[in-house]
Amino acid sequence: MTIAYNRGLTEVEAATSVSAVDTAKQTAITAMAAVKDNATLLADAKAAALAALDAAKAEYSQDDYATNWSVLEKAYNDGKTEINAAAAIEAVNSALQKATDAMAAVKNDATLLAEAKTAATDQLNSEYAKYKATDYTNANYELLTEKYNAGLSAIGGARTVDAVETALETAVAEMAAIKTNAQILADAKAAAKQAVNEAFAAYNEQDY
């Protein structure tokens, strides 16, 4: 503004004709009128930031965010609110960056599924590591390993987080259901005791 004003005075002073004076005057007035005040600059910054925020949100597809779309929309709407409420251009830029970062931080379904698979695989590996081959018959340990491998395959092939959790729970339960040598021995003892007891009960004390 000051530059336009001073230039206008200089050009008026340097004019050598009335028409040149009028031209210099009008040029200065037009130049000063074209200088944007703070309110206009702030409004322009807000409009640009809102447009940039809209463009950033348009890059995301709701189909990719079945789980977290509402979280992404909240980040977007919070950003709009902060931009509109900003009292300075710096605050506008900060609000835009904050909202853009917040949307980018929202995990899509593919990311959530990948994380669930990694976590489930790690947990299944930990469960399998608890079992020792020496505690089982060869056949039962082979069966346990089959259940473990089937679980890994089911987790890897799952298409939803719920399916991942189901695959993990199924594998863990099926491995746990396979009897150890100690359990087989205990079952045999219990069955034998029951058979002996039943045989003994068939005898009448009065007959002896």
Give, region by region, the residue ranges found by the protein language model.
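Charged, amphipathic alpha-helical scaffolding segments
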Residues: 9-27, 33-34, 81-105, 153-178
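Amphipathic, heptad-repeat alpha-helical segments
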Residues: 1-9, 33-80, 107-152, 180-208
